[in-house]
């Protein structure tokens, strides 16, 4: 598999839409590159987006032995290991999307998304939408 692009919206420290396209310069000709930046700039969130889109999981939310619920909007709570916690606070929806080339040479797109009711930041988190793949 070759990652061609990572994009998303409103995930953790990355507000609004973001995209990294590995098919255009300067990344298309780079053999190796570094993801660097200040604390909170979104380095880990980029990797979370990749994992969410491909596997519906994020390593930072690996299941622990404890089940701790965190406060969400209103009186709602959400488990600390729920990947929907990656939705940026104060936003109504978010997604992670990855374009990749498979070993068969075809291009694919994988997408994970989350939203709140009525598309309002004050709405309850909706049940998680499963990952979808397109060819």
Model-derived segments and spans:
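Extreme N-terminal "head/tail" segments of very large remodeling/mechanoenzyme assemblies
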Residues: 1-133
